[in-house]
């Protein structure tokens, strides 16, 4: 299951006139295969999500949840439909759409020999954020990893690694964050802690 978080890191609660920060109209994705025929991963999906809203996408494996995220992330090309993210049209402004989205993947894939601070600095660099404009320490505090900022990623607990993935998704201050099955494979206590961090956002 995928949890969709719509946020403004600085002042989400100050926006009284909420607008649709994510708008999906008749989104369709068909995977063509000459041997097995066409697979309709998404069929005329319509969705509007407002700023500040927490929204969940629920469904079994193969329901198209990951395909939906990958289309917005730019790694899968849609067959038809309109996608608007933070006011940017996916067809006309794909780079701006990608910059408006942060994704917390299900799989924990972190370089074990880099510290959380180093990983966030590298991530910021990928988005072209100048050093003077980076908010690395703020993000580390937001996910309660400031004390582990200079530790090797391999030394972090499972919960800390999950929070570090969340920090990576937030480092470029996107207005939309996707969490792909954030509680998969974790115990009850860790699950509660993860949701606590989500609510704090």
Name the predicted role of every residue range:
Residues 81-89, 97:
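Conserved ABC transporter NBD signature motif
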Residues 152-156:
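Conserved ABC ATPase signature
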Residues 173:
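Conserved catalytic motifs of ABC-family nucleotide-binding domains
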Residues 60-63:
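Walker A (P-loop) phosphate-binding loop of ABC-type ATPase nucleotide-binding domains
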Residues 121, 125-148, 199:
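Conserved ABC ATPase "signature" region
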Residues 177-180:
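Catalytic Walker B motif of ABC-type/P-loop ATPase nucleotide-binding domains
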């Amino acid at each position: 299951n995928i949890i969709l978080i719509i946020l403004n890191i600085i002042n989400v609660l100050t926006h009284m006139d909420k607008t649709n920060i994510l708008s999906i109209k008749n989104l369709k994705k068909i995977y063509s295969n000459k041997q097995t025929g066409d697979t309709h991963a998404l069929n005329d999906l319509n969705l509007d999500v407002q700023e500040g809203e927490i929204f969940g996408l629920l469904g079994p494996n193969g329901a198209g949840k990951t395909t939906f995220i990958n289309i917005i992330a730019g790694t899968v090309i849609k067959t038809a439909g309109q996608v608007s993210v933070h006011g940017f049209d996916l067809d006309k402004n794909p780079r701006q759409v990608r910059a408006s989205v942060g994704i917390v993947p299900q799989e924990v894939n972190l370089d074990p020999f880099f510290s959380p601070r180093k990983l966030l600095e590298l991530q910021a660099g990928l988005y072209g954020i100048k050093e003077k404009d980076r908010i690395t320490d703020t993000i580390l505090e937001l996910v309660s990893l400031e004390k582990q900022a200079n530790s090797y990623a391999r030394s972090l607990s499972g919960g800390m690694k999950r929070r570090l993935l969340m920090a990576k998704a937030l480092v470029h201050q996107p207005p939309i964050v996707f969490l792909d099955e954030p509680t998969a494979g974790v115990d009850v206590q860790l699950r509660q802690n993860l949701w606590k961090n989500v609510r704090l956002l």
